């Protein structure tokens, strides 16, 4: 069985969970036309990744998988996110014709607010709010195509991935959902994880921005190992244990 078919099947399970809140093994066997054993292995693997909680005869969606809208996220921990964004500016030289990619993270949005004051940049983004910051003629802005997710006003899907694969990015700016008990950057959906992976693969440098609260929250999908990132910037609220782990795996900056 190909890795692609496994991912597609588990994505369908996630869609069922998102729509209903819970699923039964017998129903999934019928809908997906696979064996009882295959479904149970899928549910076990998804539970280990923090996506669901197995129960007798099925599974339920874990409560922390609920997405928050971009407006709400942008107003949380604003002082901390501003500090992280200002630190990131030091690693993005002004006056150079850089190609800078942004995902739909709220801390990424905070950094974009500062970079919007510069000129001569090429901006690539999956986020409509980020694209709207770079108005006027000072910068070239490319908004990824694809399907619109209303929750955070971002675009995703194969069109977006095809576009990313055709370009070379100078710096990829990445946010993350909760990373508690995970080995790297996380996302709330498989589609968002795909965007992050594509950015990392096609960039010269990747910088992750995440406030320390993310280390206390669980998340659905792991999108990249810490070792794949060139830099992680967080605030001084990070616990010593998490600091030690990240310092061994990537260039960790604490502000």
Tell what function each PLM region has.
Residues 106-108:
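Gly/Ser/Thr-rich loops at beta-strand to alpha-helix junctions
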